Amino acid sequence: MTKQIQKTVSVCIIGRPNSGKSTLLNRIIGEKLSIVTPKVQTTRSIITGIITLNDTQIILYDTPGIFEPKGTLEKAMVRCAWSSLHSADIVMLIIDSLKPLDSITHDILNKLRSLNVVPVFLLNKIDVESKYIDDTKAFLAENYSDSLLFPISAISGENVDKLLEYITSKAKIAPWLYEEDDITDLPMRFIAAEITREQLFLGLQQELPYKLTVQTEKWEELKDKSVKINQIIVVSRESYKTIILGKNGSKIKELGAKSRMQMQQFFGFPVHLFLFVKVQELWEDNSDYYEYMKI
């Protein structure tokens, strides 16, 4: 019996916050792995997605959005994004076609050039008419003629098949790093924490989501094949804790119920979720939390 030839290729997706990196990762692997919210800077660490197509295994790295960082946490997130380039065969810069090229995007382009990285450009959100797209295409064609450009829509899937064909064509003969059915190498504890953090981002207003983190403290498999999960929501102020709890605990119950449903849908088994809120001032300056967040 002839042994199947195996190929692998790794892809790093970088770009500004809310340009569609996480949506594209989820679109390609066919699962909602990387959390997506309307708020910027939702992704804090490198999220690894895996898809195996015939003989080729594609490893995708979704990265934190690159912006001008201010605090310690923001600086760590941006460093994390740039560090992902070293692990990739292909670097893809995703650009929001609904916005003009701004100074941050130009800074990203300049840094890639200084690193001798020739990116593949992904002009995202083409499912919506844009007055900026022609100017962006013209600028990239004139200044980055060595780079390929794919106009895509991560949310609708338009042209993502062509992008996958290109990625697959760049794969090299090498043993797969993961099992054929794997979609990520992230621990389930981490994924569960990200699911809860997504619900906090969606359910809380203004700046509060940026002032918290979530840790899965306990993961206990029960005899009935369900799992008991204890999570701690860490905030920097007592007033934030009050908001998350809500009147008579109503808000945290609502957020917990939504998180539990998402976990059950993703993991495929019943979940008993218990959320607790802890106040720790300046937790953003504690490197122990960064290690847990993988940044």
Curated annotation (Swiss-Prot):
Q: Which residues bind GTP?
A: 15-22, 62-66, 124-127
Cite a GO CC annotation: cytosol
KH type-2 domain location is: 204-281
- Subcellular location, record wording: Cytoplasm; Cell inner membrane
Recorded hits in InterPro entries, A to Z, give: G_ERA_dom, GTP-bd, GTPase_Era-like, KH_dom-like_a/b, KH_dom_type_2, KH_sf_prok-type, P-loop_NTPase, Small_GTP-bd
The membrane topology term of the UniProt record is: Peripheral membrane protein
Which terms does the UniProt entry file under GO BP? Answer: ribosomal small subunit assembly
Region annotation (G2) maps to 41-45
Q: Which family does it belong to?
A: Belongs to the TRAFAC class TrmE-Era-EngA-EngB-Septin-like GTPase superfamily. Era GTPase family.
| Task of the protein | An essential GTPase that binds both GDP and GTP, with rapid nucleotide exchange. Plays a role in 16S rRNA processing and 30S ribosomal subunit biogenesis and possibly also in cell cycle regulation and energy metabolism.
Name it: GTPase Era
